[in-house]
Amino acid sequence: MTLDDIYQHFRPEEYAFIHKIDHLAQYVENTYSFITTEFLNPREFKILESVLERRGSHYYTSGQYFQTEYVKVIIAPEYYQLDMADFNLSLIEIKYNAKFNHLTHAKIMGTLLNYLGVKRSILGDILVEEGCAQVLVDSQMTNHLVHSVTKIGTASVQLAEVPLSKLLTPKQDIQKLTVIASSLRLDKILVTILKISRTQSTKLIEADKVKVNYATVNRVSEQLVEGDLISVRGYGRFTLNHNLGLTKNQKYKLEVDKMIHN
């Protein structure tokens, strides 16, 4: 299988990431040393799997050991013996007074990225419960975060590193829906799934509030395919799980998984 064979399964804007993973694998082969990736979202991990399996590369994922959405991957020579410390993975716990404050995923991520001055891939999952939140981070950032962050929004917070064994379990249910859509265009799918007007759908997309497979998309005419994950700020996330074909009226019958946070 060549890279061209892999390209056909992904969007053109993902080709650069395909090349990045291919170059990392080549580096490991040339140097006989291992390399650890930054945090990868599920779409990026799917691409990584495709590239590494094509090359016959050996790899380990933190997702084999921790139930998380974002994972880190070790690409290694065949003789490499896994050391969990090589994932460079740390768990930070955030304590705050839930009686007077309410922390959200967005508030936490915005504050941490501001303090770190880095891109999103340095942070993994952010889990929020009443009075407590957790965030997975690259280990090199642990001390800086713990000693620098004292406020998130208006809330006073206390950060501390805790063992990975204390990782919270994500609380999320899946609601399965079957819907009929006139088109696989992004704007029309949002109208169908979210039960909003075409005007509202267009405004959300053009305001950069819609992501497809974790990447912001501002084209209302973006064509969706089976397996795409769509997230809409303020509305949640859903996956086009299966395209069940056309109805007698030549409309698309789709099976959708809608994520519901408890």
Describe each model-derived feature in a short phrase.
Residues 177-226:
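A basic, amphipathic helix-loop patch mediating RNA/tRNA/ribosome contacts
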Residues 228-229, 238:
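Short histidine
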Residues 1-187, 193, 216, 237-262:
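Ferredoxin-like alpha/beta domains used as RNA- or RNAP-binding modules
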